[in-house]
Amino acid sequence: METEKKQESKVRRIVGEVLSQVLNVPILSGALITFFFFKLPSDIPNRLAGFGWALLFLSLIPLCSLFFYIPGKVQEKARVIKRQRIASFVFMIVSYPIGFLVLWLTDAPDIYEAIAVTYTLVTLGLIIVNFLLRYKASGHAAGVAGPVGALIYLFGLIATPLLALIPLTTWARVSA
């Protein structure tokens, strides 16, 4: 019975970790940017360049924070996770506003600029709550709620099933 519980706990932790990575902010922002790229009319100026810049600054650069999950000399899991969490915020708070500036300067489609501003403000809010006020707010949940809210705003009730991603993300973070 005891080993069965341990096995179940291990499976739950693995599933939680996999879902956490799939629902990771840079992955979701990349999916959102790609979705809008294919939804935008093909004759919009700077559509492809805007997509490339948005993907670079809102997805690929922030994704580099995952390299901080590599234990290196520090083997203690809690310290590795804390290091990666801090690196994540640093990558995002630097990359998002620079991305917005590049998108604005290159006259990218407004939707990419709006996404960059939104992620910048959410990240700033999370930094204030997590590091200054010392409450632990979930960046994963915020990173899922933003795109889900945007899609519901744009597409209406048809997009409401995406709301299920928010509790799924919460469960994944608690289980991981």
Predicted regions span which residues?
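Short, Lys/Arg-rich, polar N-terminal cytosolic tail immediately upstream
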Residues: 1-16
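The first (N-terminal) embedded transmembrane alpha-helix
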Residues: 19-39
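Helix-coil boundary and interhelical linker segments in multi-pass alpha-helical membrane proteins
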Residues: 33-51, 100-114, 151-160
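Loop-to-helix transition at the N-terminal end of transmembrane alpha-helices
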Residues: 45-60, 81-84
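Alpha-helical transmembrane segments in multi-pass membrane proteins
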Residues: 53-61, 91-95, 118-122, 126, ...
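Membrane-helix exit/interface motif
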Residues: 68-72, 98-106, 125-133
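Juxtamembrane helix-capping/reentrant segments at transmembrane boundaries
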Residues: 75-91
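Membrane-embedded catalytic cores of phosphoryl/pyrophosphoryl-handling enzymes
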Residues: 113-176
